Amino acid sequence: MTKVPVSHIRNFSIIAHIDHGKSTLADRLLQATGTVADREMKEQFLDTMDLERERGITIKLQAARMNYHAKDGEEYVLNLIDTPGHVDFSYEVSRSLAACEGALLVVDASQGVEAQTLANVYLALEHDLEIIPVLNKIDLPGAEPERVKEEIEEIIGLDCSGAILASAKEGIGIPEILESIVQLVPPPQDTIGEKLRALIFDSYYDSYRGVIVYFRVMDGTIAKGDRVRLMASKKEYEIDDLGVLSPTQQPVQELHAGEVGYFSAAIKAVEDARVGDTITLAKKQAQDPLPGYRSANPMVFCGLFPTDADQFPDLREALDKLKLNDAALSYEAETSSAMGFGFRCGFLGLLHMEIVQERLEREYGLDLIVTSPSVVYQVTTSKEEVILVDNPNFLPEPNLREKIEEPYVRVEMITPEEYVGTLMELGQSRRGVFKDMKYLAQGRTTLVYEIPLAEVVTDFFDQMKSRSRGYASMEYHLIGYRENPLVKLDIMINAEPVDALAIIVHRDKAYGVGRALAEKLKELIPRHQFKVPIQASIGSKVIASEHIPALRKDVLAKCYGGDISRKKKLLQKQAKGKKRMKSLGTVDVPQEAFMAVLRLD
């Protein structure tokens, strides 16, 4: 490969809400520049996981290098760094934006700006990126490019007079997009002479070569055979394969400032090459790492248990393998009296949790029971120690704790104004604090609430979508911890506490939640030969109870006529048997019961 002057490199990413056509646009750019031959082309070329294709979302980052012959007669190298659009993966988005100098802001011309797009645009503005607005899907009958331009100008404050009208599906506007990338996106700074610093924006595990790291060289040069040091994990490796992604891997000897590529160096796990880490040479180390690195902290926790206890080792192996590819996933073994052995897992958010669960079931053939998700609480004990609790069963007793603090998030919803009332009700019902409301162009409104994360992780998103008929969109970010009167709600079935059903709730909501949960469990647990009591309690005080009546076998069926004492004897024998059964009997609790906590209205 010929060496490219820095002035002829353009690094850009595409920012878009889910479903606004980002992956299709990337496909068209790859085709238009001849990077991928038409015969190799398939839909969503850069989305490699089956799950990404099915859900139509981008989960793992990808990158592609395109050679483009511009109208000014020069050859340019365009590096597209793809970003995931979902709020759970916002840290990955910020890292891939840090590797760029410009971004295409893709907005659906019929839908307008959505909350997720906003969150990512603000990230892009923080990184001082040149933003090029693109209105996609203008071939749709419902497209209103003028209205959407107004909306972008009003909400984001971007000048849209030069916005490109495009339809990725039909291939309209693609040449204009390529030209504007060359004209408007600034080239990287020429820092080839400085000490090597490169930013890792993604890494994945390959079972033959170990971890493959995707990176962007910020300063200096990197060559095959170099010994490099990762500044956050403080580990050193020798590069045995270096190359560029066009989109398939093509080896090269060296890469210099401004270029994007990959390397492998016998790294064992993705944790050792974290997203956002800085690569430098072991011999000539750079003084400071690149700014912005932070380790991904899980926000949502839940228990994963195999339905068949024999699958426990398989579950451990599957989690170990997923962890190689997913540095944000955390897990530790836990035991539950109700469910046996399993794992307590931590995730970035609900989507991340669903994806991990789905991958475990699909790729590793496991059958899982998932307990209700909880968040991390900060508990100050009576000895003035602060401990973090992610499992309701480890909450210290009331006499051993001073206070409990829970994480709060700032939730921003964008909605058509006719749904404002019902979404405000939703915010209030989730202990939300109303912060702000703005009217936007064309009858849309933003609502801002501060809500405890625990209220958001259960079914807030589903509720918001159903109340707004799917039109509202949201994004949230953590703002800190606040003290609240929280209590642990225990559920007892047949006088035995079921640890997997315990939850931490606000004291004022405990009675209602306990009542609703007991009623729900009564519907879901099948009847047994004996009466099954269900109780919800706080400490030793029972606040709600229900009974599942016993199935009654007719023992008198074969007694014709006659002797009452014979019937009495049979009935007493049955009563005795039921009594014994009640003291020894176990109650089967189906999987739906454990998920009931999620679906309390």
Swiss-Prot record:
Checking CDD domains in the record gives: EF4_II, EF4_III, LepA, lepA_C
Gene3D superfamilies listed in its UniProt record = 3.30.70.240, Elongation factor 4, C-terminal domain, Elongation Factor G (Translational Gtpase), domain 3, P-loop containing nucleotide triphosphate hydrolases, Translation factors
- MF terms in GO: GTP binding; GTPase activity; ribosome binding
Reactions the enzyme catalyzes: GTP + H2O = GDP + phosphate + H(+)
Q: What is its EC number?
A: 3.6.5.n1
One Gene Ontology term from the biological process aspect of the record: positive regulation of translation
**Which is a Pfam family this sequence falls into?**
LepA_C
Q: Provide the top EC class.
A: hydrolase
State the similarity comment: Belongs to the TRAFAC class translation factor GTPase superfamily. Classic translation factor GTPase family. LepA subfamily.
The UniProt entry, under HAMAP family, shows: GUFP, LepA
Under which name does UniProt file this protein? Answer: Elongation factor 4
Give the species.
Answer: Trichodesmium erythraeum (strain IMS101)
